[in-house]
């Protein structure tokens, strides 16, 4: 097993994931309100953007994250992590392997992995040096309508088996997040329920209070 550096910040609390928005000003405004609301982690994810737009958006969002001292995780793109010196990378089950990502990024970057509903995948990811794993979707997701469905009792087994933080994802809102936290997840990853809220900052604040 590859041990991550012990001084690395542990993933916990509210983990926000940006929506597929092309307008930089609008996206940054939304990110600002999420950060001001107390989000602990922010993942930049934009499946519709080209490489130039991704770079421009990620640079601006990283500046905001630095103001609030919140780590920025980049979805999928290792080169973008290095180009803007983001704090970490999140990879999906069919993306770059943890071992390849760790070799490319080195030991000082955070690496998270989507494990869907597969505990065995999470065990292998931990052995390969992942800093956290994400399970879900636990509820129907508006962001990924074809997402794998994960049973809530998976969190019980994961908590007993893994030694790295566990993130719950998929259709999470203020009505169902507490049930996941009670089952032992360290963080909840939220996109739709945050960025589509009428008051983004207030929504982020309410999610964050669930961990207090």
UniProtKB/Swiss-Prot annotation:
Question: What InterPro entries does the record tag this protein with?
Answer: Aldolase_TIM (IPR013785), ThiamineP_synth_sf (IPR036206), ThiamineP_synth_TenI (IPR022998), TMP_synthase (IPR034291)
Gene Ontology CC annotations of this record = cytoplasm
Q: Which residues bind 4-amino-2-methyl-5-(diphosphooxymethyl)pyrimidine?
A: 43-47, 75, 114, 144
Question: In Gene Ontology terms, what is one molecular function of this protein?
Answer: magnesium ion binding
> Which residues are Mg(2+)-binding?
76, 95
Keywords for the protein's UniProt record, in alphabetical order: Magnesium, Metal-binding, Thiamine biosynthesis, Transferase
Q: Name one GO biological process term.
A: thiamine diphosphate biosynthetic process
Q: Which reaction does it catalyse?
A: 2-[(2R,5Z)-2-carboxy-4-methylthiazol-5(2H)-ylidene]ethyl phosphate + 4-amino-2-methyl-5-(diphosphooxymethyl)pyrimidine + 2 H(+) = thiamine phosphate + CO2 + diphosphate; 2-(2-carboxy-4-methylthiazol-5-yl)ethyl phosphate + 4-amino-2-methyl-5-(diphosphooxymethyl)pyrimidine + 2 H(+) = thiamine phosphate + CO2 + diphosphate; 4-methyl-5-(2-phosphooxyethyl)-thiazole + 4-amino-2-methyl-5-(diphosphooxymethyl)pyrimidine + H(+) = thiamine phosphate + diphosphate
Q: What is this protein called?
A: Thiamine-phosphate synthase
Primary gene name: thiE
